Amino acid sequence: MPVNLIAVQPSDLLPVPGVRVGVAEAGIRKANRRDLTLIELAAGSRVAGVFTLNRFCAAPVQLCKQHIAGGDVRALVINTGVANAGTGEQGLADAHATCVAVGRTLGVAPEQVLPFSTGVILEALPVDRLIAGLPAAHADLREDGWFDAAHAIMTTDTLAKAVSRQVEIGGRTVTLTGISKGAGMIKPNMATMLGFLACDAAVSQALLDALTKEAADLSFNSITVDGDTSTNDSFIVVATGQAGNAEIADPLGSDFHALRDAVIDVSIRLAQAIVRDGEGATKFMTIAVEGGLDVVECRKVAYAIGQSPLVKTAFFASDPNLGRILAAIGYAGIQDLDVGGLRVWLGTAAEEVLVAELGGRAPTYREEDGVRVMKEAEITVRVDLGRGRARATVWTCDFSYDYVKINADYRS
């Protein structure tokens, strides 16, 4: 069961002026499920994106990178069930055929379409079925289609992930709505996750590009479920410019800071929802590392802890075998780390317990305190490296028996 992840309701999601969303059952992999999503963007919309760093980059990601560079995106098309990764030249041809078909359906050029796929790797995309499903998705286009889209992009997810909020910018109300999917193969940069965030703010392309990268780094690039990096992950931010605010072009201005805070907030909530719905997860863990020389080494330590199977299984069992945390810190690759200056805490919203200091177990630590904290569903591991002022946070979950079962049964 997801960890404190509340099922989203249709009324929770706000339409974004300039964006219409439709879904359809295309039978990509399984019958009788909505697996095709079409998103139409108003003319003049600006789009930014960041994509997987996996060298085995999927065909749709390769095409997305080319098309987004053109600077005039009018549509997004997303299929679930088949990733169209590891499919060679045929995969690229299928992704291109998808863009051609979407362009014909919407009256735009193929180069104005961004394709996205998620699902099983090394299987050919049934492009004929996808294209046959486009008329139904087109007929379904509407401003309030976000709820259905959040469900249509799911794979092993157990709950849809979607967030809306509004913010005042330049005397205008700006609306943001985002959806994401992912539950396994989650580890930056990024993972088997798709994220789509739309707003109606008017913002320069340069600032939108920078903001998208920053938001991804602070959210989707700060989560891990199992340490595997996918071939298909993509995070897209759309700004339609229809809110009526003066275009935001000053990175130091209050308007940009308001938009920045809102985009990062929605991105973090979408990313955390992925971890809360991690395959087989029973605990949501925040790994907060401070006192580093720079953010890079803080993130190294946080990921070493958050990706350790031994740490994750200990948390599943509520077993305070906390030497596993110290071992993970030790192999994180931090040069000249003085373990005698380390301090480690376990915490919840109600309390924080000092576990280790001066290179060993804290004199005040009692195992029953560790057990009490680890029995909670939400736990923070705080580490002070004691060598600087930098800090970083990573979110992860535990490993349960169900993680193995879900992945063993994935293709069945």
UniProtKB/Swiss-Prot annotation:
Pathway: Amino-acid biosynthesis; L-arginine biosynthesis; L-ornithine and N-acetyl-L-glutamate from L-glutamate and N(2)-acetyl-L-ornithine (cyclic): step 1/1; Amino-acid biosynthesis; L-arginine biosynthesis; N(2)-acetyl-L-ornithine from L-glutamate: step 1/4. Its EC number is 2.3.1.35, 2.3.1.1. It holds the Pfam family ArgJ. It catalyses: N(2)-acetyl-L-ornithine + L-glutamate = N-acetyl-L-glutamate + L-ornithine; L-glutamate + acetyl-CoA = N-acetyl-L-glutamate + CoA + H(+). It is found in: Cytoplasm. GO terms for biological process: L-arginine biosynthetic process; ornithine biosynthetic process. Coiled coil: none annotated. The record marks T118, G119 as: Involved in the stabilization of negative charge on the oxyanion by the formation of the oxyanion hole. Heterotetramer of two alpha and two beta chains. This is Arginine biosynthesis bifunctional protein ArgJ. It comes from Aromatoleum aromaticum (strain DSM 19018 / LMG 30748 / EbN1) (Azoarcus sp. (strain EbN1)). The lineage of its organism: Bacteria, Pseudomonadati, Pseudomonadota, Betaproteobacteria, Rhodocyclales. The gene is argJ.
